[in-house]
């Protein structure tokens, strides 16, 4: 446990502040998750608490390199850096950060970190000895609480940075950006020498540097647009310009804290020529900081070629930026209400340029026309056409948007007229004012698809109620008729009433009731017999206990009321029958447990050995592959410390096709009993192409071995086709979930969704029927903090979004729906007991009744992984108990495959011993646990049935909330899903911390002797030899294919530009290009992911 008496290591630290009082100085923090780490839920909570305690926070989000964090910290001149690191490589990461800070004049900046149980006590001591101010452990969290840890950080950083500011302008004028940052701090704090400020303005006046002001309403996309303009300045001028960006965000009146959130959106500023500084408005009561004139002067004195000022969001009557800039750009969206509202917008009087951003929204064309006419009226330029006004329609979220380029070229002309030195640009000149691109992932006419699906499910249940009532009444009337007739009384009227109900019963419902006696007979014997053509397939239905009791594989209800029978058949039914509530297959596959054999550590050789170990003795090889974080983010291994430390940690390092061949060596990837699951998303298309080529090359090698020669071109084509039709497995590749919760997006969302569609089209064209093109995942949404209902609702909503997107591309529902699979988390909450039941029923009903899909498409197949969030670093031996309970409910709910987490995953990559224990949990349930011999044990439980209905209705209501926001993509744009996940995560953490939610061994039933386990655990880390081997193999691969790689990358880029099938080209590209080479080539034409707050 960390020693709390270990106070700040810097001489500048102040005595602890009075508890409950904000910092005496303006404390600024940079917060981020470490490189190749998408776990940003905790750091988001931390930065919110920092803000509430009066700190100004520059939040960088997930996946940030040491260089990015240090550059931000130096330019923003902060007192502290807070980093969460859950993905391994933390020792190298934090040490590299301390080294860079010391090298670049930031030695007084204090570094704080945390990573749950991933950073073990010995490593905490090592890092703190090296210079990290504090690494917070899980024990610290329990003892201090979230707010206590943040207070500790703020107190340690409560120092006045003015002491470090330059006393002359010499270093600033000479181009020292660190000195500029420190001068800005003094100016912002109002503590700069007045004579120095006067000299500063004199220097600025002589510099004649143009200033571009960008302002607009909150949420208009100013930061994204600013970043896209900077990207075009860099491209067009070949990085010859030096640009300063001053970004202003509002301070919170109550706490004085501020979220300085523009930097997180910037992808184009990572260059030595770009300087960015975030300012809080503080006490200004305006959209600009009181220090802005001085800060602009400082940037001019520093001899930048251009200064860009971006203000915080403004109202209709605000135009405070205008006096401070030479050129102003007003950014708005099409949703401004009636055209008369435009007359109230002050900036339309003053702005030199207007951008209507988010131009893909409904009514954008009309908005552009109305704004252009208003600008024309304001300027009284009746001699010009309204469409010639400097009003542009832009889509900053769309990579390489031509509307943004048109705006950029208009700005360049105006800046040149104001004296800015520019060379002829390299970007082609574009004519026009508005973006011609339209994002049609889901057509606008289908934006309410989720609400329609909710209506479909509810309509189905209304029909169930009505039809079961008719069936009950028909049976009752017939019985009454028979009794009256038997007693010699008149019964014709009853016969008429019964006939009316018979006619009102639907054909499907009559068929279900007619087949009920046959179903009872089929399941009543010792075997279930199905005839397919002339062949009988027999399945044993009886297991006999040691006591001689016969346990049936499927147990039917004993209802005699036809209304209840029909209701059960329509809402439940036996496994394998619509609506598949109890399962999509009639029986589990004999001899194949749903066990996934999980591995991923070190290099491909070590993980291959682990696969062979965990699958030993198993007839079915169900290999589940975890990749290291370098691979997850599409990069190659590298010796740079923040990359090097993560190579082969928390997963296997795969950079080339040769690595992939080693990984699955010895496993026949086309064998029906072999399937491979690959947990990867951002670079999934490239990894999938490597896997498919590995499977193909296995069979070509087999042909050579069997025939003693190479196959002919025709034979090779047949082998390729056969392999694609027979290979079994799953790739996760779920980009929507990544954007909402997991954060391994690397490309722009639009481009990633386009390539997902390319993969599915390729699968359809090549008849890839046994491999899932996507695993639509709720697991990582749950791991990010979502409760079970949100997990299920968001996951199903994402699945239906893919359905709508693929239908919009012209694919038929039955050609692609069978390639979709799902992946859920289990946990300790009661709702987890029915996740599969609810998911299967909603999917089946909507697929049949809304989309007209066939039986195969109606079957939702899903994988379950026990909850990683429920694994705790304290009393880790208790984790297996939680995992066992979660595995039990997954098996009871008929999941199609199951992965049980190892008990030590809260701290390290699973060891051989812990993986064996995790596998044993499943084996014991499947082979020893008596009730598991029955394959529908949940059916008939009053609690399970009620939970199913409650959870289903909660999911449908969430569908409607998402539909109100324009569907999944519209909700993502406003951060709806991410915000809800974070709220639910914080709620869980609060209940865990205050003990309201009891967690055994964590906040109650604590070991009185402490918890020594983390000290003695074997930590799974990649070895130095494995890392060096990966670097060496990568160098060899690059050398062997040097002659072909660049031409192939050019072909790949051109495929994107021409809007051709990218995956088809990737199938060739992976043979000569590494993962990192492909990723960076696609960045150039597909765009990088833009992080959200």
UniProtKB/Swiss-Prot annotation:
Q: Which residues bind adenosylcob(III)alamin?
A: 39
InterPro entries registered for this protein in UniProt: Acid_CoA_mut_C, Cbl-dep_enz_cat, Cobalamin-bd, Cobalamin-bd_sf, GTPase/Isobutyryl-CoA_mutase, IcmF, IcmF/GTPase_domain, MeMalonylCoA_mutase_a/b_cat
Residues binding Mg(2+) 1: 223, 262, 310
Reaction catalysed by this enzyme: 2-methylpropanoyl-CoA = butanoyl-CoA; 3-methylbutanoyl-CoA = 2,2-dimethylpropanoyl-CoA; GTP + H2O = GDP + phosphate + H(+)
Q: What EC number(s) does this enzyme carry? A: 5.4.99.13, 3.6.5.-
Chain spans, region Linker: 418-579
- Cofactors required: adenosylcob(III)alamin; Mg(2+)
Q: Which GO terms describe its molecular function?
A: cobalamin binding; GTP binding; GTPase activity; isobutyryl-CoA mutase activity; magnesium ion binding; methylmalonyl-CoA mutase activity; pivalyl-CoA mutase activity
What residues bind GTP, as annotated? 219-224, 265, 357-360, 973, 1092
Q: Where is this region: Disordered?
A: 1-20
Tell me one Pfam family matched here: MM_CoA_mutase
Q: For the B12-binding domain, which residue ranges apply?
A: 26-156
> PROSITE patterns annotated for this entry?
B12_BINDING
Q: What are the BP-aspect GO terms? A: acyl-CoA metabolic process
Region ranges (GTPase chaperone MeaI): 169-417
Question: Which residues are substrate-binding?
Answer: 587, 622, 728, 772, 821, 856, 861
What's written under domain? Is composed of four functional domains: the N-terminal 5'-deoxyadenosylcobalamin binding region that is homologous to the small subunit of ICM (IcmB), a middle P-loop GTPase domain (MeaI) that acts as a chaperone for ICM, a structured linker region involved in dimer formation, and a C-terminal part that is homologous to the large substrate-binding subunit of ICM (IcmA).
Q: How does it assemble?
A: Homodimer.
Return the similarity comment: Belongs to the IcmF family.
Q: What does this protein do?
A: Catalyzes the reversible interconversion of isobutyryl-CoA and n-butyryl-CoA, and to a much lesser extent, of pivalyl-CoA and isovaleryl-CoA, using radical chemistry. Also exhibits GTPase activity, associated with its G-protein domain (MeaI) that functions as a chaperone that assists cofactor delivery and proper holo-enzyme assembly. The G-domain of IcmF also has a role in its cofactor repair. Does not display ATPase activity.
Under NCBIfam families, the record lists: acid_CoA_mut_C (TIGR00640), acid_CoA_mut_N (TIGR00641), IsobCoAmut_IcmF (NF045497)
Q: Know the name of this protein?
A: Fused isobutyryl-CoA mutase
Q: Which classification does the entry list for the species?
A: Bacteria, Pseudomonadati, Pseudomonadota, Betaproteobacteria, Burkholderiales
Tell me the name of the encoding gene: icmF
């Amino acid at each position: 446990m960390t020693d709390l008496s270990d106070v700040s290591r810097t001489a500048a630290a102040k005595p602890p502040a009075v508890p409950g009082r904000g910092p005496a100085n303006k404390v600024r923090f940079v917060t981020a998750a470490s490189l190749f780490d998408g776990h940003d839920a905790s750091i988001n909570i931390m930065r919110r608490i920092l803000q509430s305690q009066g700190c100004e926070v520059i939040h960088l989000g997930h996946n940030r390199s040491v260089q990015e964090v240090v550059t931000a910290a130096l330019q923003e001149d902060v007192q502290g850096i807070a980093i969460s690191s859950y993905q391994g490589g933390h020792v190298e990461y934090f040490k590299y950060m301390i080294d860079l800070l010391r090298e670049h004049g930031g030695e007084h900046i204090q570094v704080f970190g945390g990573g749950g149980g991933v950073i073990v006590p010995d490593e905490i001591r090592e890092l703190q000895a090296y210079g990290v101010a504090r690494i917070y452990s899980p024990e610290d969290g329990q003892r201090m609480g979230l707010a206590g840890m943040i207070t500790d950080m703020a107190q340690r950083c409560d120092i006045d940075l003015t002491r470090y500011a330059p006393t002359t302008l010499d270093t600033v004028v000479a181009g020292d950006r660190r000195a500029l940052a420190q001068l800005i701090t003094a100016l912002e704090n109002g503590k700069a020498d007045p004579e120095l400020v006067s000299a500063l303005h004199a220097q600025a006046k002589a510099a004649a540097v143009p200033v571009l002001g960008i302002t607009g309403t909150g949420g208009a996309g100013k930061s994204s647009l600013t970043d896209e303009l900077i990207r075009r300045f860099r491209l067009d001028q070949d990085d010859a310009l030096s640009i300063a960006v001053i970004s202003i965000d509002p301070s919170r009146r109550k706490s004085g804290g501020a979220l300085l959130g523009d930097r997180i959106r910037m992808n184009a500023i990572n260059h030595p020529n770009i300087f960015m500084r975030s300012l809080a408005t503080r006490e200004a009561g305006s959209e600009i900081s009181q220090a802005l004139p001085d800060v602009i002067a400082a940037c001019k004195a520093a001899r930048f070629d251009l200064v860009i000022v971006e203000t915080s969001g403004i109202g209709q009557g605000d135009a405070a930026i205008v006096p401070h800039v030479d050129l102003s750009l007003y950014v708005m969206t099409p949703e401004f209400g009636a055209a008369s509202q435009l007359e109230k917008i002050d900036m339309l009087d003053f702005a030199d340029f207007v951008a209507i951003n988010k131009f893909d929204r409904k009514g954008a064309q009309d908005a552009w026309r109305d704004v252009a006419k208003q600008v024309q009226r304001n300027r009284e330029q009746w001699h010009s056409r309204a469409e010639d006004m400097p009003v542009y329609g832009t889509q900053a979220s769309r990579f390489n948007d031509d509307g943004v380029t048109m705006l950029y070229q208009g700005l360049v002309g105006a800046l040149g007229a104001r004296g800015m030195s520019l060379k002829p640009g390299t970007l082609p000149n574009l004519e026009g004012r508005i973006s011609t691109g339209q994002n049609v992932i889901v057509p606008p006419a289908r934006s309410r698809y989720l609400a329609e699906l909710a209506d479909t499910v509810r309509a189905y249940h209304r029909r169930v109620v009505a039809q079961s009532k008719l069936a009950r009444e028909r049976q009752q009337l017939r019985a009454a008729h028979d009794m009256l007739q038997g007693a010699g009384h008149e019964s014709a009227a009853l016969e008429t009433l019964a006939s009316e109900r018979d006619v009102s019963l639907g054909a499907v419902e009559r068929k279900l009731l007619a087949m009920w006696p046959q179903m009872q007979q089929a399941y009543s014997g010792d075997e279930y017999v199905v005839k397919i053509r002339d062949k009988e397939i027999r399945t044993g239905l009886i297991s006999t206990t040691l006591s001689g009791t016969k346990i049936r594989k499927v147990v039917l209800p004993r209802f005699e009321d036809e209304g209840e029978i029909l209701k059960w058949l329509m809402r439940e039914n036996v496994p394998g029958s619509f609506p598949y509530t109890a399962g999509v297959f009639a029986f589990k596959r004999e001899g194949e447990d749903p066990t996934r054999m999980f591995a991923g550590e070190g290099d491909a050789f070590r993980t291959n050995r682990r696969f062979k170990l965990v699958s030993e003795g198993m007839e079915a090889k169900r290999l589940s592959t975890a990749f290291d974080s370098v691979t997850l983010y599409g990069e190659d291994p590298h010796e740079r410390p923040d990359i090097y430390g993560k190579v082969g940690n928390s997963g296997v390092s795969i950079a080339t096709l040769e690595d992939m061949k080693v990984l699955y060596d010895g496993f026949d990837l086309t064998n029906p009993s072999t399937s491979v699951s690959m947990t990867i998303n951002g670079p999934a298309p490239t990894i999938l192409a490597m896997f498919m080529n590995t499977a193909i090359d296995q069979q070509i090698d087999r042909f050579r071995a069997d025939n003693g020669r190479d196959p002919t071109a025709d034979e090779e084509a047949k082998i390729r086709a056969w392999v694609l039709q027979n290979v079994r497995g799953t790739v996760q590749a779920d980009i929507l979930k990544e954007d909402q919760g997991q954060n391994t997006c690397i490309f722009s969302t639009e481009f990633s969704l386009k390539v997902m569609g390319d993969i599915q089209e390729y699968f359809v064209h090549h008849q890839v029927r046994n491999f899932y093109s996507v695993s639509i995942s709720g697991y990582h949404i749950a791991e990010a903090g979502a409760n079970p209902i949100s997990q299920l609702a968001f996951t199903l909503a994402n699945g239906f979004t893919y359905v709508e997107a693929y239908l919009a591309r012209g694919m038929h529902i039955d050609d692609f729906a069978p390639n979709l699979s799902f992946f859920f988390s289990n946990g300790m909450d009661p709702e987890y007991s029915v996740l599969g039941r609810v998911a299967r029923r909603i999917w089946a009903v909507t697929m049949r009744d809304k989309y007209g899909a066939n039986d195969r498409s109606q079957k939702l197949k899903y994988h379950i992984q026990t909850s990683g969030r429920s694994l705790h670093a304290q009393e880790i031996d208790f984790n297996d108990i939680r995992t066992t309970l979660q595995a039990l409910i997954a098996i009871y709910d008929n999941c199609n495959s199951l992965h049980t987490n190892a008990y030590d995953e809260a701290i390290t990559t699973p060891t051989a011993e812990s993986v064996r224990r995790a596998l044993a949990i499943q084996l014991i349930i499947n082979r020893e646990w008596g009730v598991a011999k029955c394959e529908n044990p949940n059916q008939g439980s009053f609690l399970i049935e009620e939970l199913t209905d409650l959870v289903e209705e909660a999911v449908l209501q969430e569908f409607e909330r998402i539909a109100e926001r324009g569907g999944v993509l519209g909700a993502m744009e406003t951060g709806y899903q991410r915000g809800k996940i974070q709220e639910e995560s914080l709620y869980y953490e609060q209940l865990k911390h205050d003990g309201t939610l009891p967690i055994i061994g964590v906040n109650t039933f604590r070991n009185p002797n402490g918890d020594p386990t983390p000290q003695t655990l074997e930590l799974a880390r990649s070895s130095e030899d494995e890392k060096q081997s990966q670097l060496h193999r990568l160098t060899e691969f690059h050398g062997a294919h040097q002659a072909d790689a660049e031409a192939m990358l050019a072909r790949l880029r051109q495929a994107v530009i021409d809007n051709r099938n990218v995956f088809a080209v990737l199938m060739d590209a992976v043979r000569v290009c590494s993962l990192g080479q492909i990723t960076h080539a696609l960045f150039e034409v597909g765009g990088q992911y833009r992080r959200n707050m």
